[in-house]
Structure formats: C-alpha cells, structure tokens
C-alpha cells in the first residue's frame, strides 16, 4: 500500500520490452509516477527542468502504449489504483512519498519536486546546533 511520508513499497514493474524494474533500484533520483497521458505530455515538454531537479518521471499503464515519458507497466495493478486521474506520485531520492494526489498541471509537479529537493537531510542544522 502506498502511503504519504513512507517509502514506496518494493513493487516490480515491467518495461514494454519485457524488462523488470524493481522500484528500490530507482533510488538516487526524485521520482514522479503518472497515469495521465496529457500530464505526461506536458511534463515531457519540460524535460530540461526535470533533469535540473535530478528527477525522473514515468508514465504508468497496464498495457504497452505510446508514451511521451518512459513507460512502466503495472500488470498486476499494484500502483495504478493508488494514482488519481490527473494526479501524480512524487517521491524523494530515497523513495519516500511526498505527494500522492491531484495536481493542477505540470507546474505543480515541478513545485513538488522543488519542495522535495529542499527537504534533503544535509540542508538542515544538526540537532546539536539547535541548542
């Protein structure tokens, strides 16, 4: 089950070519998962911004289809039901889910990625420095 502020479950998805993608192997970059093709198209047009934010976006589907973003197949329906239509899942580089819900467009997805980037553990004072 996908939950906010929890690590993304260790699901295995497929590529259209038959390869397997184990979600924990995607650690190291912020992650965006979508199921809305129009949102995927809008986000793919802003690929340079995604790259600058160190993020990777994927379109999820149950069957192969043309996609403006890399396509991942959720054949077992493990993740697709968790994503709302027109919504997104945004996770940090450690795959902690920060957003799972509706978005008003690609700009809001990018805003979530900027927020996630600002949450890095190195960006805050160590606890000892608070006193």
Name each model feature, range by range:
Residues 1-131:
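Chalcogenol-based redox active-site neighborhoods
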């Amino acid at each position: 089950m996908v939950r906010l502020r929890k690590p993304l479950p260790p699901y295995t998805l497929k590529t259209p070519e038959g390869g397997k993608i184990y979600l924990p192997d995607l650690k190291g970059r912020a992650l965006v998962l979508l199921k809305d093709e129009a949102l995927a198209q809008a986000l793919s047009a802003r690929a340079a911004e995604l790259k600058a934010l160190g993020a990777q976006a994927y379109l999820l589907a149950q069957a192969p289809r043309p996609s403006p973003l890399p396509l991942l197949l959720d054949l077992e329906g493990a993740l697709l039901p968790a994503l709302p239509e027109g919504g997104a899942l945004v996770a940090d580089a450690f795959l902690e889910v920060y957003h799972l819900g509706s978005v008003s467009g690609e700009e809001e997805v990018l805003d979530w990625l900027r927020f996630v980037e600002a949450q890095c553990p190195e960006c805050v004072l160590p606890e000892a420095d608070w006193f």
